[in-house]
Amino acid sequence: MKTGALATFLALCLPATVFATTLRLSNEVDLLVLDGKKVSSSLLRGAESIELENGPHQLVFRVEKTIRLPGNEERLYISPPLVISFDTQLISQVNFQLPRLENEREASHFNAAPRLALLDGDAMPIPVKLDILAITSTAKVVDYEIETERYNKSAKRASLPQFATMMADDSTLLSDVSELDTVPPQSQTLTEQRLKYWFRLADPQTRHHFLQWAEKQPPS
């Protein structure tokens, strides 16, 4: 898709539905999967928030933070992938509250027994279910979407089976042909639909920045 057409396509993707929950992102949280779908890191990079509908949600993420080592040295701590499920039915804002993670001892404790909180707009705790996402794949590059689907089918602590069935077949992401001016190959259509999905979730500022970037890209 040419860049100008891409920008126009995305501009038309603004949701007609009024979203009711704002998920405030943290620069210490690497969001990997949202509600069974792999996160588009390029689209959400630098975003301060994403908009969600009211109802149950599930995040897969890693905590990434620079910690201190002996001798005034530092290293980047990356937690194991975590799964957290929660409900935003009566909540308008969700904020991460991470525990203190400043050194190797605190990082080791977090690895063994991760704990964190989600707070609403009044800084009140939101009921959550938190678990570690055990990776079954031996591939060098982990497909967190597939791993999350397996997790959600296994009746674990933070499993939400409805998000496993949603991702069982990528064809469920494809909309009617009438939404597109032309019919591209199915793989390209799926790429567009995924991009459309994440564009709709991004906050207005992130949408604006992405459209500016898209306009500057050379035509394919």
UniProtKB/Swiss-Prot annotation:
Q: Which cysteines are joined by disulfide bonds?
A: none
Residues annotated as signal peptide: 1-20
Q: Which controlled-vocabulary keywords does the entry list? A: Signal
**InterPro entries given for it?**
UPF0319
Q: Does the keyword Transcription regulation apply?
A: no
Q: Does the keyword NADP apply?
A: no
Family matches, as NCBIfam families: CrliSynInhib, PRK03641.1
Q: Which HAMAP family match?
A: UPF0319
Q: Which family does it belong to?
A: Belongs to the UPF0319 family.
Protein name (record): UPF0319 protein YccT
